[in-house]
């Protein structure tokens, strides 16, 4: 596809998408508003395009997928994926807290149980991806191919445990404090404030205030985290990808054995 792009294609794409109706300008720091608006109008006020802004109404739906790709390396890299939450889903902060506890760092359950206690993986973690109309929750691990079955077994055990019983409220509280602290520290950077404000306006239609984010994080309970984990970690909708040394492993069979 990319090889087929030529100068005319790129130029047409630019003309179609890059114009005033499609731009968000975000400014942060030491400036005078009227002076800044004057300068922006001077530089960009005459920038006209005939093509109107087009809001695409297509909806991206999660599709169960299984992908395997052999590569000439010693390790195997595996991702297990579940339908996640959209960017504006009311439980997105509950999922963020769950992800932090489950696989979001070196103190998470996945890292401690599978890498530290059992020494089975080179790396293991989870993360969330959110878009306007869909999302994905992903677990990633890299390991010696001989350890794959045991790693799948332990991941399955962890999934069962975290969807069977809520995390202690004290642990939830500590995680929320950590998330809020990281968020506040991030807002101390002028560059971060500028980027966050612009992205919020572009993607949400308004600038999300710091106090709003903090309040929504603080409002999450252990019951919210458990309910969200149960909703997201639907093993009937699990997808997987495996890349690397695939010899000796039937990944479809392993997924069926431990997650179905």
PLM region spans:
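His/Glu-based metal-binding/catalytic segments typifying zinc-dependent metallopeptidases
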Residues: 52-109
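Charge-rich, well-structured scaffold segments of protease-associated domains
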Residues: 1-52, 68, 85-86, 94, ...
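Catalytic cores of enzymes that engage adenine nucleotides and/or redox cofactors via long glycine-rich
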Residues: 113
């Amino acid at each position: 596809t990319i090889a087929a792009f030529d100068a005319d294609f790129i130029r047409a794409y630019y003309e179609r998408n890059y114009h005033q109706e499609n731009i968000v300008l975000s400014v942060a720091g030491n400036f005078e508003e009227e002076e800044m608006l004057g300068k922006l109008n001077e530089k960009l006020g005459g920038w006209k395009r005939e093509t109107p802004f087009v809001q695409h109404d297509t909806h991206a739906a999660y599709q169960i997928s299984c992908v395997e790709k052999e590569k000439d390396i010693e390790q195997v890299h595996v991702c297990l994926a579940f339908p996640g939450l959209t960017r504006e889903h009311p439980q997105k902060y509950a999922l963020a807290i769950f992800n932090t506890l489950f696989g979001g760092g070196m103190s998470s359950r996945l890292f401690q149980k599978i890498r530290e206690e059992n020494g089975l993986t080179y790396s293991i973690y989870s993360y969330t991806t959110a878009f306007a109309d869909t999302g994905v929750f992903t677990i990633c691990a890299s390991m010696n191919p001989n350890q794959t079955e045991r790693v799948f077994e332990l991941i399955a055990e962890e999934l069962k445990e975290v969807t069977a019983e809520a995390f202690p409220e004290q642990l939830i509280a500590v995680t929320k404090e950590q998330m809020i602290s990281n968020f506040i520290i991030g807002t101390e950077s002028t560059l971060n404030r500028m980027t966050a404000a612009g992205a919020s306006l572009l993607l949400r239609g308004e600038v999300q205030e710091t106090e709003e984010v903090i309040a929504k994080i603080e409002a999450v309970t252990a019951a919210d985290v458990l309910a969200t984990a149960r909703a997201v970690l639907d093993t009937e909708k699990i997808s997987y990808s495996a890349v690397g040394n695939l010899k000796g492993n039937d990944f479809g069979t392993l997924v069926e054995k431990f997650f179905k």
